[in-house]
Regions:
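Output/docking surface of receiver
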Residues: 83-124
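Conserved sequence signature across two-component system core domains
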Residues: 9-11, 34, 53
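Phosphate-coordination loops involved in phosphoryl transfer and adenosine-cofactor binding
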Residues: 2-3
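Conserved phosphotransfer microenvironments
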Residues: 37, 50-75
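Short alpha-helical segment
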Residues: 39-42
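Short beta-strand elements of ligand-binding domains
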Residues: 10, 56, 79-85
Length: 124
């Protein structure tokens, strides 16, 4: 079985992306990272078969809605979760919106939407 893989897009701040990455990798998900809108689009073109995208609504280089539309132009059915430190955002084109500071909510949502068949097996 193959573990699900996510593209995580965020600012290049200490701890911001590493926390999400650590949470996802601890749950046995694979993670690819991007630190700007341009890098996100280029990375998604290179790896269009990721299981989903987790992005910060204030990613550098563009506004949230524009980036979501650009990513969906590459693959229209991609699962897209937006996180924000301001709570619910105006990025309504995303599939789901979560608070930046609630990694448990992100993990619970991903476990529900994209179950990892290896998570239980690998944790034994």
């Amino acid at each position: 079985m193959i573990r699900p893989c996510f593209l995580v897009i965020d600012h290049e701040f200490p701890d911001s992306i590493s926390t999400r990455k650590l949470v996802l990798e601890t749950a046995k998900y694979n993670v690819i990272t991007a630190y700007s809108a341009n890098e996100a689009v280029a990375t998604f073109r290179m790896f269009p078969n990721v299981s989903g995208i987790v992005m910060n609504e204030a990613v550098t280089g563009t506004d949230c809605g524009s980036l979501v539309n650009e990513l969906r132009a590459i693959r229209s059915d991609i699962l897209l979760i937006v996180t924000s430190s301001r709570g619910p955002t105006d990025c309504v084109v995303a599939d789901h919106q979560l608070n930046n500071f609630d990694p448990a909510a992100l993990l619970n949502l991903l476990r529900k939407l994209v179950p990892n068949p290896l998570e239980h097996y690998l944790s034994e």
